[in-house]
Amino acid sequence: MEKFKYKYLIKCGTNLFNRIGTCEVHSQIISEVLVRSSFCGHDSHGLQRFTEYKKLFEDKKISANGKITKKIVDNRMFVNGGNNWGIVVANEVINELIDLSNKHSICSALIKNCNHIGRLGEYISKPAMQKKICLAFVNSYDSNRKKVVPWLGVEGKLTPTPIGFGCPSGYKWPLMIDITTSAMPEGKIRDYMFNNKRLPEKCIVDKYGKFTNDPNKLYDDSNGAILPLGGIFGHKGYALTILIEILAGGLTSSGYVNEKNNKQGNGVFFIIIDIEKFINYEEFIYRTKSFIKYIKKTKTRENDKVLLPGEPEHNLFMQNKKNGIKISKRVLKNLEEVNFFI
């Protein structure tokens, strides 16, 4: 199977979005984020999203010329994304929030009217590379994406909500936690479907509440749903989902998943903490590296190796950037149908 190079795929993606009416700069930003996700091993937020984003744009769910407005009050930034590309909005906001954090110990940004922002790791890593800690909470206020069951339920009422944490590690890679509070991200389940694979046990249920490992059950007329994170302790993942809905849906005024507003996108809540305003940075890094070394010395099973959150993505990205990546037949076919390749 053919392997595709990093810069080539970014060029193809930039051309696709530019061709449908997005400016060159924004087209490249979106393309870089999506391609980087696949090269980090997260296809659920990678190449498969090109065709999805194109359709959203053509269905007028995204406004490439939507005005992004910001209001800064002390250490808080209030953002209206103007229904613009979510990746463009989030990228712009995180960069400006980093600048704002140079003046404040802790600062935050609340974003509404923002389309899908892609992989959280893209944003939480930036402050982490600049001596800062970042927290991120994202909800989806699209009532059509209610695919996650509340604890003990069998009916999709919630959406897969991610939570993120980025922090300097003292190594070439930042510590990064980017997880969804459902058993699996919806996009990851789509990956299994595209590759004709069975899901791990007890990730989704059918409309009768019975466990199934058939990913198609989430998308066909059977009205399947994803279980909350945690397995038999799923009440914990469910509780985190409620927390994220409150912060990213309520506090930002984006709206909760039950509000039928005929919109599609994300409510986003970013927090950046300037480490140097709390503790000497070198001391923080020294102690953090010592902690990481302590974790890495854990005894393991044969051929296993303890890694820290964010380390696998860094290693895989460097490997894939050198060698290129393969694209599944289903995603490749979808990309060819929209004339992605140049």
Question: What would you call each of these model-derived segments?
Answer:
Residues 131-147, 244-262:
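Glycine-rich phosphate/pyrophosphate-binding loops
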Residues 77-170, 179:
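A generic, well-ordered mixed alpha/beta core segment in the N-terminal half of proteins
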Residues 4, 9, 19, 246, ...:
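Catalytic-core signal marking the mid-to-C-terminal active-site face
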Residues 1-4, 12-29, 35, 43-61, ...:
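Acidic, glycine/proline-rich low-complexity segments that act as flexible tails and inter-domain linkers
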Residues 46-98:
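Active-site cofactor/substrate anionic-group-binding motifs, chiefly glycine-
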Residues 143-218:
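Phosphate/diphosphate-binding glycine-rich loops and adjacent basic-rich segments that engage nucleotide
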